[in-house]
Amino acid sequence: MNTRDLEAFLAVVETGSIVGASVRLHLTQPGVSRRIQSLEERLGVALLDRQSKPLKPTAAGRETYAQGRRMLRVLDDLKTGLSPKGVVSGEFRLGISPYLSEVGITTLADRLRGSFPDLLLRITTGWPEQLLEQLRRSEIDVAAFCLPDGMHPSTEIEADALDIQPLFVVASQSLDLPSPATLQDLSPFPWIFNQDGCGFRSSIQRRFEQEHLPLRIGIEALSSDLRLSLVARGLGITVATRAAIESSPLRAALQIVPVQDFEPRVRAWIVRRPPVGRLVRPIACLTSALEAVIDEQAPGSNQRDSS
């Protein structure tokens, strides 16, 4: 089997189009099409549903994708092992949650590119369940995300637990809230969260369910800066890390609300499917860089008065 034909097929599946694959592989569109046709002729099956937009693999195509991705990974491992200096090359596909991406994507990318200049880094964002599913389908090599403290990733994958991060309830200074407040006091207010699937949001939802209290979702906003801006305007309350609160340009308009018997926390995880082969060192580098990013978000790293 021609590995270049296989690479073209994988690129079409991952980009969803001949155009996207041609850009990724630096080939003409007819060149990509010829490679796909060559692979289909060799295997004797149709690999793509050409009526779908974006292009999607057939049942045979999905199996070919999974097997082909593993095959190319083995070849990359072999190349790395035979390299005179052990140079790590090939793709490193990282899936990362929006929060970790927001606070540390540049640090992670810089560290990986500096340590492994021949490694082609591909990064996607998603919520934990999405990333775990992509990991199961071999669409990514490793995932980094946060889960509420006490929750663990699936047992069929390898997972490294990183530091726990405390979260703080944040409201506008204009809101007259008792200090400390109770969850009952907070229940009437709308909450400003990420979309469903966020570890922060899951942590709050679980506790409100335990107390049999309604949780009102007022606004869904992806950026922590935007959420804090909306909170400062009195449009709702949210949770955030200490570092995000203290670094906000609207800090003077925000108050951290102590809440009785409520200390929401999330833990960061690095997860992957064994074996990792040539990616052992890049994953170790990623883990070290992410630990440094999380340390910077710790309460003591940039702490001011909490009111």
PLM regions with names:
Residues 42-43, 64-86:
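Alpha-helical linker/hinge and terminal dimerization helices associated
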Residues 156-191:
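Flexible hinge/capping segments at coil-to-helix
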Residues 153-160, 165, 225-275:
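Beta-alpha-beta core module
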Residues 127-132, 136-140, 146, 197-255:
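Hydrophobic hinge/microswitch elements
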Residues 40-57:
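A short LG(V/I)-centered, amphipathic sequence patch enriched
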Residues 10-28:
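Short helix-boundary/capping micro-motifs
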Residues 104, 177, 255-300:
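A late-sequence structural motif
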Residues 89-152:
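Central regulatory/effector-binding core of bacterial HTH transcription factors
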